[in-house]
Structures are given as C-alpha cells and as structure tokens.
Amino acid sequence: MAIRHFKKQVQESSDSENSSSDEKSTTARDDNYSSNPMNESELHLSTKANSDSDSGKDGPDSSSSSSSSSSSSSDDEVTLHKPVFLKRKRKDEQNQPEETGENGSLVRAAYLAKALRQKQYTENIVASETSDQSILSQIIAIDDTDNTNPEQEQLQWEQRQQARLKRERQKKLDKQLLIEEQEMQRASQLSKVDDPWLKELDLNDDSNLNSFDLKASSRNRHPVNSKKDISIPARLQKGQLQLASSHTNNDTEDTEYGYIEE
C-alpha cells in the first residue's frame, strides 16, 4: 500500500510540474506577443505549420496502423463468387426438335412469314377503307327527294310495280312454254315400243280383243235356245213390214219406207 501511495504522489507531482511548465510557456508567449505583435494572418500561418508538422510526425504511424488493419481484415474475409442462374427448359421446348440453324434458314422463314402476315393485314385494312368509302359514296348518291312531289312518286311507284308484275308473269309463261316444248320433243322422239305406258295399253287392248273373240267362238259352237233366250227378237216377214194406213189411196207414197213396200 505504501508503494502505491508513493507512486500516486509521484504522478501528482509530475502533473503539477507539467501544469506549471504550461503556465510558464503561455506567460512567455503572451509576453512575446505583447513585445512583438503579429498580424492575424501570420498567426494563422504559424498555427497551420505547427499542425502540419504534428501530422507529419504522426503520419507514418497512422499509415502503418491502417495497412496492418487492412491486411488483417483481408485475411479474415472469404472470397464469394457471383452466382450463375441456369434457365430451365420448358416442356413445349423439350418436345420440339432441335433447330439446326447454322445458316439461319428457320429464322429467315419465320421472319418472312411474319412480314407476309403484316402485309396481308395492311392490305385488308386498305381494302376495308376503300369499301367503306364506296359504301359511303353510294349512300350519299341515294335519291332522298321523295317528299318533293308525293303524288308523282306514288304514280311512278305504281308503274314500277306493274312492270315488275309483268316481268314475273312473262318469266312464268316462258318457263311453262319451255316445259311444254320439251315434253313435245320427248314424245316425238319416243315410239310405242320405247314407251312403257303405250306398250301396256297395247297389251291391254290385245287381251280384251282375245277375250271377246273367245266368247264369240264359244257362242257359235253352242247355238242359243229360243225358249231360253226370250230377249232375242225374231226376224220379221215381208208381209209384216207393211204398215196399216188410214188413207184409202192404194198408190204408194214416196217415203223412207217406200223401198220396203216395193
């Protein structure tokens, strides 16, 4: 404990000595300034020079300390490389075949197709614009002066209506005449042998005639009995042909039955 107390006293004594020396230097400086007054600029320059000298003295130490600290920090740091991200292929790209485009033929074909589509699109736009203009011009050219003379317009409409009906009637008539002419030509070209309908009629007529002949022949073979067939009239005799006359004249009259009387 005695040693520590002694050291403290020594330190206190040294501090007191330093303070006394500083006071002496300041008093001496004040005396010098009072004896040799200086300008503010000179004083500023002197203080700046002192500060530069102090920094020059401390410079190597500071640079050495900074270099040592940087070297130690560089040793502690670990170098990290920049990450590289790889793109994953899509499913549709995987399914597609690989393009061998050394000469760029596929790229050129795609470019030409795109240019062709663009050209077609522009042509369609131009065509639509021209069609719109033509439609607009037709709309503008429509005669909308119907209200100027309604009676005359009504009369003209009736005339147009009659003309339309006449044209339709004439068309129907021409069509009917054409059909009739075609039928006549077809009938003239066909013969009875070629026409199945006429052939069928001929067959029916032949069958009817054959049946009639068969009936007549059977009737001739079997004579009709007069007692049974009462409906068949008997043949008249010559004396029965003379009609009773109310006239007493015996002369024959010129009548339609005169040849019978003779």
From Swiss-Prot:
A Gene Ontology biological process term: RNA splicing
Entry keyword Ribonucleoprotein: yes
Keywords, ordered alphabetically: mRNA processing, mRNA splicing, Nucleus, Ribonucleoprotein, RNA-binding, Spliceosome
Biased composition (Acidic residues): 251-262
Superkingdom of source: Eukaryota
Keyword Cell cycle among record annotations: no
Extent of Low complexity compositional bias: 61-73, 151-160
InterPro entries membership: MFAP1, MFAP1_C
Region of interest (Disordered), residue spans: 1-106, 141-160, 202-262
Biased composition (Basic and acidic residues): 21-32
Listed GO CC annotations: spliceosomal complex
Places the protein is found: Nucleus
Residue ranges, compositional bias (Polar residues): 239-249
Single GO MF descriptor: RNA binding
Similarity comment: Belongs to the SPP381 family.
Oligomeric form and interacting partners: Component of the 25S U4/U6.U5 tri-snRNP particle, a subcomplex of the spliceosome.
Described function: Component of the spliceosome and rRNA processing machinery. In association with the spliceosomal U4/U6.U5 tri-snRNP particle, required for splicing of pre-mRNA.
Protein name: Pre-mRNA-splicing factor SPP381
